[in-house]
């Protein structure tokens, strides 16, 4: 049984736009992680923890959107 999920062209364009936005933001977040890492002790480094959390969130959303896009039919 085919359980295809359909999406409009505009919907797919919005999905791709969001993926592209996240991919553009990712290098900035990676730089923020590197800068925060230079502050020293990572166990008490709030900037580092926040930057790593943002990086994880971006990576998770990119992964989710890419998997979702692969399942959709326009």
Language-model features: locations:
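Structured alpha/beta interaction-core segments
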Residues: 68-74
């Amino acid at each position: 049984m085919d359980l295809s999920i359909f999406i409009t062209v505009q919907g797919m364009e919005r999905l791709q736009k969001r993926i592209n936005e996240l991919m553009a933001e990712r290098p900035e977040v990676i730089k923020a992680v590197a800068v925060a890492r230079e502050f020293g002790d990572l166990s008490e480094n709030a900037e580092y923890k926040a930057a790593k959390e943002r990086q994880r969130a971006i990576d998770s959303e990119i992964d989710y959107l890419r998997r979702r896009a692969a399942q959709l039919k326009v």
